[in-house]
UniProtKB/Swiss-Prot annotation:
It comes from Arabidopsis thaliana (Mouse-ear cress). GO terms for cellular component: plasma membrane. Residues 837-868 are cytoplasmic. The gene is RLP32. SMART domains: LRR_TYP (SM00369). It is a single-pass type I membrane protein. InterPro entries: Leu-rich_rpt, Leu-rich_rpt_typical-subtyp, LRR_dom_sf, LRR_N_plant-typ, LRR_R13L4/SHOC2-like, RLP23-like. Pfam families: LRR_1, LRR_14, LRR_8, LRRNT_2. Keywords: Cell membrane, Glycoprotein, Leucine-rich repeat, Membrane, Receptor, Repeat, Signal, Transmembrane, Transmembrane helix. This is Receptor-like protein 32. Gene3D superfamilies: Ribonuclease Inhibitor. It is found in: Cell membrane. Residues 33-815 are extracellular.
């Protein structure tokens, strides 16, 4: 019985002891299993306080993720997105908010820099957001930082000198902002290895304190306004691998000490004002240099023979070098790794023999640019010579004075890119060109070609899948119909045959290209018939202006969901206003000028339209007062916030840029490239009547407004005073009455205005812009008077001023604000408009990422890619 009692009493004792053991024993010490502690409460609270200062810009698109959405009060901050903690202490060590769609204006009291609860941060990454304002000096509180990345934001002001006190930093990226002034002293950051301050507005000379940074490996100063000479003792940076300072105003000679740095692999100093004789000095042996770009400077003299010592060179750009003599290509034969060679615009006095060059031993080169030099090429060669030593992939011969198509190219079966534009080549384009199996890009523009050889179609039949993607043949003398072989180029993305003498209709077989064709330019030909009804689902730009096209706009265009530019000007199209095009969510440019369009301009909400030209048609009727309420791209609702980065339409496409002709400041001007922030509205030379809609004042981003030669009546809306970006205003040749609104005198960008041939009266506004106009701008308005008018029209009659202005003018300001309120009150409509806004301004899809914009790769990202 005793034994039984003992056994039953031991069991509960042993179990309770085991529970106690499990809860108290530190298994981590035995098994080495890490357990993440809960984050510290004061740090969680600090992060939540920080979150309140951020606004998430929605929608958040590809490549961007709203990191702070996972931050919640009832969860462990160590598990939040963008947060890395110490596994033992729970201390927040890393804060990564990059690409998070965050917007905030920083100031001296911003929580991020003032809370001491995050003082042990080692990494702070705010890159690729929409942060603005100035960096406060208290950033030095983060004394443990090793990585600080503020790149690709909108930070302004000077770079705070206190950053130089962050002595533990190894990585600092301030690129892609709006910093101004001189760089502060960074000489105490002895651990720094990577420094990027490119793409700002920094001034002054080369920051000499940087020469103290002995561990520096990557240095980028590009795209600023630095001046003066580069230091002669650049060799102090003995660990430098990557040096970029292109796009500044550096002068003086190229410091030869650069080439004694044994670790240096990349130098880019293009687009400066460096001068003198090109010399490389004592080159380190063996040289590790792989990239050398010193193009677009003011160097003179021959290419130094010592360049042959750069035995690992892969990319060499010496373009725009004033060689003042012949080019000795033998100096490149020792560069066995050379792949890209740019010798364009050398100002050489001799002719480059392409045949001799192709017979040389530059076998590693796959891309060569000789544009802007005198180049000769034997056109008649034997079959035995069809196998040159040199096989090249990319050849650029633009503006080389070539008069016949180089026959030697027919054996270049590895060629992918051929630019032979801006020469004097006449006759027909040879059929064998299209048999080159890897050919992707051909530029034949600005020559004297008359047609394509008949053997072209036979040549294409020999290729299973033609690879051609870009065919540019503009500004030639091509005649006859559009060649049918083009329909067989089923990978074609860009087709430009503009400015030729082609006739006939657009072939229906071009529907074969509906899956790939993005840019079609056939303007300035003699094409007739109707527009194709095929659905080019990838079409982004269609320009068929200045032809003889008839009929109507195909209603199938409503399914061109990718369309951004539609230009049908100067044809014979007879149709009503295509209001249905407003459903195209990406349409930005619409040009219907000089056709036979007629009837009313129906009310339509063109949310994304930035340029519209309806001039020289037969449109009639009135425009309702709220006509422009939802034209968001021309209003501040979709205005780009990046004024410093002037981006053009088609920037992401190297081989094609949209253009448009507009009446601007009284002159017909061609915009060879279209700025993304440029906006214009031209309704001139029609039969429109009634009052000018007061909602015109909502278009605050408008640059050009032309309503001339219509039958508008009533007063000029005072709401036009809201058009803060307006540069050109033409309301001449109407029946307008009343005064010129005084508010127009406050428009500082308004350089041209025309009020002539109306029934205007009263005081002409003051202001510099009005005083700079010609007298003709006010002609045939006998009731106008004022000092501004007296200055531009010497002898005028000034009637007595009226005592009372019409009550309509007194109410206009209130009414335009009513339209603004109405616009804001449109609930779902405005949400839809804002969605389109962000698509246009902040969406960065793959096709938009090459140059783009504000989300271009930073210098250190490019560097990392090279290492991979």
């Amino acid at each position: 019985m005793k034994d039984s009692w003992n056994s039953t009493s031991i069991i509960p004792f042993t179990f309770s002891s085991l529970i106690f053991f499990l809860f108290t024993f530190d298994f981590q010490d035995v098994f080495g299993v890490p357990t993440k502690h809960l984050c510290r409460l004061e740090q969680r609270d600090a992060l939540l306080e920080l979150k309140k200062e951020f606004k998430i810009k929605k929608p958040c698109f590809d490549g961007l993720h709203p990191t702070t959405e996972s931050w919640a009060n009832n969860s462990d901050c160590c598990y939040w997105d963008g947060i890395t903690c110490n596994d033992k202490s729970g201390e927040v060590l890393e804060l990564d908010l990059s690409r998070s769609c965050l917007q905030s204006r920083f100031h001296s009291n911003s929580s991020l820099f003032t809370v001491l609860n995050l003082r042990f941060l080692t990494t702070l990454d705010l890159s690729y957001n929409y942060f603005s304002g100035q960096i406060p000096s208290c950033i030095e509180n983060f004394s443990h930082l090793t990585t600080l990345d503020l790149s690709k934001n909108y930070f302004s002001g000077g770079i705070p000198s206190s950053i130089g006190n962050l002595s533990q930093l190894t990585f600092l990226d301030l690129s892609g902002n709006e910093f101004v002034g001189e760089m502060p002293f960074f000489g105490n950051m002895n651990q720094l290895t990577n420094l990027y301050v490119d793409s700002n507005d920094l001034t002054g000379i080369f920051p000499l304190s940087l020469l103290n940074l002995k561990h520096l490996s990557d240095l980028s100063l590009s795209r600023n306004q630095f001046t003066g000479t580069l230091p002669s003792n650049m060799s102090s940076l003995s660990n430098l691998e990557y040096f970029e300072a292109w796009g500044n105003a550096f002068t003086g000679t190229l410091p030869s000490s650069l080439f004694t740095i044994a670790s240096l692999t990349s130098i880019n100093l293009r687009n400066n004002q460096l001068n003198g004789t090109l010399e490389f000095g004592n080159i380190s042996s063996p040289s590790t240099l792989t990239v050398l770009d010193i193009s677009n400077n003011n160097f003179i003299g021959p290419i130094p023979k010592s360049i042959s010592k750069f035995i690992n060179l892969q990319d060499l750009d010496l373009s725009h070098l004033n060689t003042q003599g012949p080019v000795d290509f033998s100096i490149f034969t020792n560069l066995k790794s050379l792949q890209l060679l740019n010798l364009s615009h050398l100002n050489t006095t001799t002719t480059i023999d392409l045949n001799a060059l192709f017979s040389s031993h530059l076998n590693s080169i796959y891309s060569m640019d000789l544009s802007g030099n005198h180049v000769s090429a034997t056109t008649k060669i034997s079959v035995a010579d069809h196998h040159p030593t040199q096989l090249i992939s990319q050849l650029y011969l633009s503006g080389c004075g070539i008069t016949e198509f180089p026959e030697l190219l027919r054996s270049q079966h590895k060629m992918t890119n051929l630019d032979i534009s801006n020469n004097k080549i006449k006759g027909q384009v040879p059929g064998w060109l299209w048999t080159l199996p890897k050919l992707i890009f051909v530029d034949l523009s600005n020559n004297i070609f008359t047609g394509f050889e008949r053997s072209t179609e036979h040549g294409l039949s020999l290729i299973t899948k033609p690879s051609m993607q870009y065919l540019v043949g503009s500004n030639n003398n091509f005649t006859g119909k559009i060649p049918s072989f083009i329909c067989a180029l089923r990978s074609l993305i860009t087709l430009d045959l503009s400015d030729n003498n082609l006739n006939g209709s657009i072939p229906p077989c071009m529907g074969n290209l509906k899956s790939t064709l993005s840019f079609l330019n056939l303007r300035q030909n003699r094409l007739g018939g109707g527009l194709p009804r095929s659905i080019f689902k990838s079409l982004r730009s269609l320009d068929v202006g200045h032809n003889q096209l008839v009929g109507k706009l195909p209603r199938s265009f409503i399914r061109l969901s990718a369309l951004e530019v539609l230009n049908v000007e100067n044809n014979r199209i007879n149709d009503t206003f295509p209001f249905w095009l407003s459903s195209l969510k990406k349409l930005q440019v619409l040009v219907l000028r000089s056709n036979a369009f007629h009837g009313p301009i129906h009310h339509a909400s063109f949310h994304t339209l930035r340029i519209i030209n309806l001039s020289h048609n037969q449109f009639s009727g009135t425009l309702p007062a709220n006509y422009f309420v939802n034209w968001n791209a021309m209003s501040s609702l979709m205005a780009t916030e990046d004024r410093s980065q002037e981006k053009y339409m088609g920037d992401s496409f190297r081989y094609y840029h949209d253009s448009v002709v507009l009446m601007n400041k009284g002159l017909e001007m061609e915009l060879v490239r279209i700025l993304k922030i440029y906006t214009a509205l031209d309704f001139s030379e029609n039969k429109l009547e009634g009052e000018i809609p007061r909602s015109i004042g909502l278009l605050k981003e408008l640059h050009v407004l032309n309503l001339s030669s219509n039958a508008f009546t009533g007063h000029i809306p005072s709401s036009m005073g809201n058009l803060r970006e307006l540069e050109s205003l033409d309301v001449s040749q109407n029946k307008l009455s009343g005064e010129i609104p005084q508010e127009l005198g406050n428009l500082s960008y308004l350089a041209y205005m025309n009020f002539s041939h109306n029934q205007l009266g009263g005081l002409v506004p003051g202001g510099t812009q009005f005083r700079r106009q010609n007298c003709s701008s006010f002609k045939d308005n006998p009731g106008l008077y004022g000092s501004s008018l007296e200055e531009v029209c010497l002898d005028i009659h000034a009637p007595a001023p009226q005592q009372h202005e019409p009550p309509e003018l007194e109410e206009e300001d209130r009414e335009v604000f009513s339209w603004i309120a109405a616009a804001i009150g449109f609930g779902p409509g405005i949400a839809f408009g804002l969605t389109i806004r962000y698509i246009l301004v902040f969406y960065k899809p793959d096709w938009f990422m090459h140059t783009f914009g504000h989300l271009q790769p930073s210098a250190h990202e490019k560097r990392l890619r090279r290492k991979q």
